[in-house]
């Protein structure tokens, strides 16, 4: 299927992990993709382009800091110049700086809020003018089950991801009349290169606590993004799609 044929998407934080999976899934579904990277080496982004360049669509990487308001404006203008339009925005860039509150520094709190939450304001604000002009657009924000229920040792991360949920619902209400949709995805325990660094018994403990008895995959999240980005979800906005194997059932 080519569920995203002819559409152009921006994916922030698209050079590794979940972001890379989203880029690949969008390409497979016929989308042109502009993806950003910031904390990773340019070689990683270039390797991703080389892997996907023969799929018959356009793909390009941009080194850009989503936490920088002006940089986001520059990015959107550059993507418009390079691709001729924007139809989908996936706000995926994010970091963790976990610690108990008593040990968490102000800098670590501020950094996580800036990268995880303010970046979504920055990018949505920058792309809004494009979507309003064409009276169509699709925004997908990457939250987390931690933003739904909290987690000890992640007060900064939980606050940022919970903020995304409120932002998503508000933007859906503001822009729905202009045919602009905004939804969020809340992944649960997803097995990536980050979780591969954890002790095997820790990973197994997570798996055992999940009703489906496994961790999620990058593909699980990417497939959900394809659904929300496509016309198959054209009557869905302001929603939070939890991809968590049943971790949260209430």
Where are these regions (language model features)?
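Substrate-binding pocket helix/loop in short-chain dehydrogenase/reductase
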Residues: 100-101, 108-113, 195, 206
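Conserved glycine-rich cofactor-binding loop
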Residues: 8, 15-17
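Alpha-helical segment proximal to the catalytic Tyr-Lys
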Residues: 129, 173-177, 234
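Conserved glycine-rich Rossmann-like NAD(P)H-binding loop of the short-chain dehydrogenase/reductase
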Residues: 29-46
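Active-site helix of classical SDR
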Residues: 124, 160, 168
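Residue(s) in the substrate-gating loop at a strand-loop-helix junction
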Residues: 144
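Short, small/polar-rich loop/turn modules that mediate ligand/substrate recognition or access, typified
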Residues: 176, 181, 236-238, 244
């Amino acid at each position: 299927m080519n569920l995203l044929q002819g559409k152009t998407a921006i994916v922030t934080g698209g050079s590794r992990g979940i972001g890379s999976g989203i880029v690949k899934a969008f390409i497979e579904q016929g989308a042109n993709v502009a993806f950003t990277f910031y904390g990773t080496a340019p070689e990683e982004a270039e390797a991703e382009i080389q892997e996907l360049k023969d799929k018959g669509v356009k793909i390009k990487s941009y080194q850009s800091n989503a936490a920088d308001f002006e940089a986001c404006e520059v990015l959107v203008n550059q993507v418009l110049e390079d691709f001729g339009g924007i139809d989908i925005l996936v706000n995926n860039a994010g970091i963790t700086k976990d610690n108990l509150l008593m040990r968490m520094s102000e800098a670590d709190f501020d950094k996580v809020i800036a990268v995880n939450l303010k970046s979504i304001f920055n990018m949505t604000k920058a792309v809004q003018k494009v979507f309003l002009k064409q009276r169509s657009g699709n925004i997908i924000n990457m939250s987390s089950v931690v933003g739904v229920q909290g987690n000890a040792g992640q007060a900064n991360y939980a606050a940022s991801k919970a903020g995304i949920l409120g932002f998503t619902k508000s933007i859906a209400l503001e822009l729905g009349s202009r045919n602009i949709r905004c939804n969020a995805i809340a992944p649960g325990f997803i097995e990536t290169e980050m979780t591969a660094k954890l002790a095997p018994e820790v990973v197994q403990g997570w798996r055992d606590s999940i009703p489906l008895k496994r961790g999620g995959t990058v593909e699980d999240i990417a497939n959900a993004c394809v659904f929300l980005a496509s016309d198959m979800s054209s009557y869905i906005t302001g929603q939070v799609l939890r991809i968590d194997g049943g971790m949260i059932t209430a």
